[in-house]
Amino acid sequence: PLIPVAGKPIIGYILDQLVESGIEEFVFILGYLGEKIKEFLEDSYPKIKKQYVIQSEREGLGQAIYLCGEFIKDDSEVLIQLGDTILDIDIQVFMHSKYNTLAIRKVQDPREFGVVELDEQGIVRRLVEKPQIPVSNLAIVGLYLVKEWPKLIHCLETNIKTGRKTKG
């Protein structure tokens, strides 16, 4: 997130886009370099409402999202964006989807990404994490709109309690 692009950290571009889209509340998941990220956010974005969650053990994206549960109301729609990718997307259009939504992009070598397999209507049939034999070339790019937050938290809690993981 702190890697500079044209003199500005990646997370700065991401936050500028989200703030311009009208998002007012943020929960940041901190792990490696967490204090430096927090310092950057406090110095560069003092006016946004923010909470911090510490992910002390790197147990994956699902666990990181689960840790945010205490800060998010059950009736909330939640936009999740990973902090290491700048996207050229209209966040407002994305947020107005009536469905749970994730952003995807065609890539040359899908083995380096989580990918989606779509049905005939363009609905996600399944997600496959870094497949050796790709089911598609549609990579998940780290932007998710969750319309049913309580269901997601319940599923993540079940996965964590049963030790279900995609890798490791």
Residue ranges and their predicted role:
Residues 3-4, 8-81, 86, 91-92:
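Conserved N-terminal catalytic core of the sugar/cofactor nucleotidyltransferase
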Residues 4, 117, 145-147:
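Short, well-ordered beta-strand micro-motif
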Residues 61, 111-115:
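Glycine-rich phosphate-binding loop of ATP-grasp-fold ATP-dependent ligases
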Residues 81-84, 105, 146:
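Active-site flanking residues adjacent to catalytic metal/cofactor-binding acidic residues
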Residues 89-112:
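Conserved donor-nucleotide/metal-binding helix-loop-beta segment in metal-dependent transferases, i.e.
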Residues 95, 123-168:
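Catalytic-core segments of class I nucleotidyltransferases/pyrophosphorylases
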Residues 102, 115, 143-145:
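Conserved hydrophobic/aromatic beta-strand scaffold that supports enzyme active sites
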Residues 117-123:
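Short acidic-glycine loop/turn motifs at beta-strand connectors
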